[in-house]
């Protein structure tokens, strides 16, 4: 049996061909409709007695259905241990003398629409929702139909936890939310997938050439890494798959998105259910698990369950 021999010249030829193919496919796709994303400038003031410190940053994004307006007020937390404000009778620990206040709510547990409505019914002038634990500085524009009369922005988990812990320590926190810059999403998902495939293919041929031309000495570390990769693939294959269909609650536009790609779930989407019961698009989570082995939300290791 003879195998194709990959040489640097072959690699260059293949890469050039792939580039021409990508340009052809790029020009073949119909124009995608641009979708505006508005950032939010947050002027945050921390007051302890007579000591006041402030910080200003473009640290949030407006929700897709939020009015683009300036709003300000003292920050109030949901009462009780749970900070997601999913219970319809949730109260907020706001100062009585405050004329205007903003609800700080944790993402998760229910839809964005429900959280915002709970805060609005309690008299909030705006809602700040901070992302899941473990998402670091990631934010995205929320979908919350039916709440178009109240300003709603998302901030990162890191910034949300900073404000939360400050208030829990007795710090008086006020926030001014102002409209930031507009960004357009001109690139369609098809083109994103195309360039992802193109980059992965070129990287494969490049690394393959390097691998073939570099002397290799087998060692225990290499064998161990190969065994772990094999174990991860087996563990992934044993995880449950599910095809979403009309009527599933995950298809509600107000439900949480896939945290890997931030796309909403649609009928016929194939999702992978992890042992921790979190689920994601199969096409998104499989590469993630191969690289990280852990759930992107709770860090559950699929090899330890």
Swiss-Prot record:
Keywords: Glycoprotein, Membrane, Metal-binding, Signal, Transmembrane, Transmembrane helix, Zinc, Zinc-finger. Abundantly expressed in testis and slightly in pancreas. Mainly present in the interstitial cells of testicular tissues. The keyword Glycoprotein applies. One of its GO terms (cellular component) is late endosome. Gene3D superfamilies: 3.50.30.30, Zinc/RING finger domain, C3HC4 (zinc finger). A zinc finger (RING-type) spans 258-299. GO terms for molecular function: ubiquitin protein ligase activity; zinc ion binding. Pfam families: PA (PF02225), zf-RING_2 (PF13639). Glycans are attached at residue 43. It comes from the Eukaryota. GO terms for biological process: ubiquitin-dependent protein catabolic process. It is a single-pass membrane protein. The chain crosses the membrane at residues 185-207. It is found in: Membrane. SMART domains: RING. InterPro entries: PA_dom_sf, PA_domain, RING_finger_E3_ligase, Znf_RING, Znf_RING/FYVE/PHD. CDD domains: PA_GRAIL_like, RING-H2_RNF128-like. Residues 1-34 form the signal peptide. Residues 65-167 form the PA domain. This is RING finger protein 148. The gene is RNF148.
